[in-house]
Amino acid sequence: IAAMDMLQGGMSWDEIALLSKAIEAAGASIISTHFTWHESQVPTIATMVPRRAFTGVTKRVRKEVSITVITSNRINMPDVAEAVLVDGDADLVSMARPMLADAELMKKAAEGREHEINTCIACNQACLDHTFAMKTTSCLVNPRACHETMIKWGPASETKCIAVVGAGPAGLAYATVAAERGHAVTLFDAADEVGGQFNLA
């Protein structure tokens, strides 16, 4: 359900609560909440939106029913999801774009390797924008997303010492893949921090 549709003349909270109870009474075992419609033109999943910005609304729905309630939107890392659950805002957390950014997100979290997770930055450019343009979905921070059968790499047949000059997005991506393939990689940049031009965003 749209737990908050942000449309003029849209559903009131009383109507949303009534709908939630009716869904439970009809026999549903789970309610998945989302926020706004595309027509509302209110950002809810863009980078500018704080993480877990709308889970408090899900918590209100949860108080109206006794079945499992799922929340979503701008929950991109395991610690954020865990905080949502600990705070009682939801019973389950829905994550989609973070899985495009890193298909091994859950595995890394379970193994205590959260620092290795390739984080979704909520740019929406290669996932949602591509989808709406009828293009193949992908991810700016993981170009292999939805192209895994075309973009393949395995261990290098011969390992090398590689110097990568430039720690912007392209340099970081190349250095990461080279290291995953077994090469010894040294990354150089004139700046004191990594990120290159992306830091301007």
Descriptions of predicted regions:
Residues 1-165, 169-185, 193-199:
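Flavin-dependent oxidoreductase catalytic cores
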